[in-house]
């Protein structure tokens, strides 16, 4: 990197980027204190320090000018992290609180010249990326961490650093950690045995500390797609499958969906993919909610306080906070594997998944944008976005033939259109999707006993309504179904049943003889319900 302005760029990037903040002490109590700042003859109360003790910027090789906040007297005992966590849990009913930290403490690592962290033996290192990484993403050559450096602790002290950090968090009633900024670890392995060996030691120390301090295996791995990270997840079960969701970057909203779906082909075999948070009251809120519903992933939002779309959230989450999570990671259907669902102008993305009994396919028009290496940002395509035609059939769900009766037919119900069709394994239905439009289809095997045909489809009010069906069996002229949830349950029947019971109580179903649509009210109480149908 013998650029003419290299040193100037280094100072500017390092000084301006929060990626070059470094840890200079573990406790973050200062961030949560209420301190009085005197300025312009007026006193104002701050609920947060702009540069908290855990994250304060102290740049190696450059003089750091202290802020006005840094000159205030310390007050360790006031409004600490434990008090904040307790307030969140007691006043707002939040059951679990996780805290963020980077793999090496913060993006810029651990400060090499601070007395409080001197015991970790941190030294400044500048990432050395492999030729393959620089070919795929040339911008890594001038990434803030590459230019500004990372404070890398001695491998022998990492275990102690994690223990001290997690001791503090656990004592503050924190339930787990989200460990970010992992991908750079391989580029910092020189003089530490190489990237893979260094990553192995780091993850072993991290996971051992997590097991000791967060018994529920409370760790989310993030920005961790280099293989030296993924292949060292020995007990970690959850990892991000994508870049961030950027609410203000419109071009990124569709690309994000493509990234998580295609990355889950690989990551879904190793971890539970995390498709990141989204915002419900957002122009792309429903689109992203629909993908999370069938992704088999975590479901969480980054809504601004008071800005929530409950029509969307209620289709994702029950009143108890439970979700109808699919059984595995959502993956693209075979006919999408080698198509460009973001740029070719004609291919809709199709995502398949399985539930306990039924299957699900989501179709999405996410054409029109991509990541530009030339500009190093998400970019919308110049040509207008056209509608795409999506065709889907039951066999798009991998393994469905092995799980079904030979020669079976399937009931296919669309969530938004509420349309019911009966298809054979290779028969298809189709839908025209406008830009950023979507639909979710529940696929339920059609059971047959004599002249009676029946399928339990799922809750009509939930995106992944088919996930509510936990068990079904049909014997003679009766069928028994176990379902979870509340509200309207959709079924299909070739003829109206003579009686239906929910938890032993007789109910009056709605039946449409033209379509075979059979609706049963499970009531307003969320829970597991036993249903019996008789003909």
List PLM regions with ranges:
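Catalytic and substrate-binding clefts that recognize carbohydrates or anionic sugar/phosphate headgroups
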Residues: 1-46, 281-282, 304, 315, ...
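Aromatic- and glycine-enriched glycan-recognition loops and surfaces
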Residues: 4-5, 15-137, 153-163, 198-204, ...
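Loop/turn elements at helix/coil->beta-strand transitions in domains of secreted/extracellular proteins
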Residues: 92-97, 172-175, 214-218
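Hydrophobic faces of well-ordered beta-strands that scaffold small-molecule active sites
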Residues: 97-99, 177-179, 219-221, 301
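Active-site beta-loop-alpha junctions enriched in small/polar residues
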Residues: 100-106, 182-184, 222-226
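Glycan-recognition surfaces
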Residues: 113-167, 204-312, 325-348, 352-355
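Active-site groove signature of glycoside hydrolases
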Residues: 164-188
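Non-catalytic C-terminal accessory domains or segments of carbohydrate-active enzymes
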Residues: 335-336, 358-362, 371-375, 384, ...
């Amino acid at each position: 990197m013998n650029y003419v302005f290299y040193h100037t760029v280094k100072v500017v990037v390092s000084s301006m980027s929060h990626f070059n903040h470094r840890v200079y002490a573990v406790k973050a109590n200062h961030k949560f204190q209420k301190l009085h700042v005197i300025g312009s003859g007026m006193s104002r109360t701050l609920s947060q320090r702009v540069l908290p003790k855990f994250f304060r910027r102290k740049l190696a090789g450059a003089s750091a000018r202290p802020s006005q906040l840094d000159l205030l007297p310390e007050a360790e005992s006031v409004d600490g992290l434990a008090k904040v966590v307790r307030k969140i849990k007691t006043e707002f009913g939040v059951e679990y609180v996780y805290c963020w930290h980077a793999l090496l403490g913060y993006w810029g690592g651990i400060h090499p010249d601070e007395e409080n962290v001197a015991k970790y033996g941190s030294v400044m290192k500048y990432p050395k990326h492999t030729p393959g990484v620089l070919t795929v993403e040339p911008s890594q050559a001038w990434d803030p961490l590459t230019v500004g450096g990372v404070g890398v602790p001695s491998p022998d002290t990492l275990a102690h650093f994690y223990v001290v950090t997690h001791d503090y968090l656990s004592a503050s009633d924190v339930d787990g950690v989200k460990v970010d900024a992992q991908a750079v670890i391989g580029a910092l392995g020189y003089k530490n045995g190489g990237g893979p060996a260094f990553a192995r030691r780091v993850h072993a120390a991290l996971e051992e500390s997590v097991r000791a301090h967060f018994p529920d295996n409370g760790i989310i791995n993030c920005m961790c797609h280099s293989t030296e990270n993924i292949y060292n997840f020995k007990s970690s079960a959850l990892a991000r499958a994508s870049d961030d969701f950027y609410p203000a970057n419109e071009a990124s909203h569709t690309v994000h969906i493509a990234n998580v779906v295609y990355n889950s082909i690989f990551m879904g075999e190793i971890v539970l993919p995390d498709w990141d948070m989204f915002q419900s009251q957002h122009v792309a809120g429903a689109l992203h909610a629909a993908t999370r519903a069938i992704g088999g992933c975590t479901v969480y939002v980054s809504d601004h306080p008071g800005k929530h779309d409950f029509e969307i959230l209620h289709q994702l989450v029950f009143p108890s906070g439970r979700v109808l999570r699919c059984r595995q990671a959502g993956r693209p259907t075979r006919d999408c594997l080698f198509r460009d669902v973001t740029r070719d102008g004609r291919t809709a993305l199709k995502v398949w998944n399985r539930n306990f009994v039924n299957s699900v396919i989501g179709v999405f028009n996410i054409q029109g944008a991509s990541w530009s290496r030339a500009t190093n940002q998400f970019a919308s395509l110049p040509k207008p976005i056209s509608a795409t035609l999506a065709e889907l059939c039951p066999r798009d769900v991998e393994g469905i033939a092995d799980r079904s009766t030979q020669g079976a037919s399937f009931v296919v119900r669309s969530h938004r259109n509420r349309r019911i069709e009966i298809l054979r394994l290779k028969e298809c239905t189709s839908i025209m999707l406008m830009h950023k439009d979507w639909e979710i289809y529940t696929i339920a095997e059609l059971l047959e006993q004599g002249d009676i045909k029946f399928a339990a489809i799922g809750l009509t009010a939930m995106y992944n309504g088919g996930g509510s069906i936990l068990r079904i069996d049909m014997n003679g002229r009766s069928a028994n179904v176990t379902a979870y949830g509340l509200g309207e349950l959709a079924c299909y029947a070739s003829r109206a049943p003579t009686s239906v019971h929910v938890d032993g109580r007789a109910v009056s179903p709605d039946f449409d003889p033209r379509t075979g649509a059979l609706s049963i009210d499970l009531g307003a109480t969320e829970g597991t319900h036993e249903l019996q149908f008789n003909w």
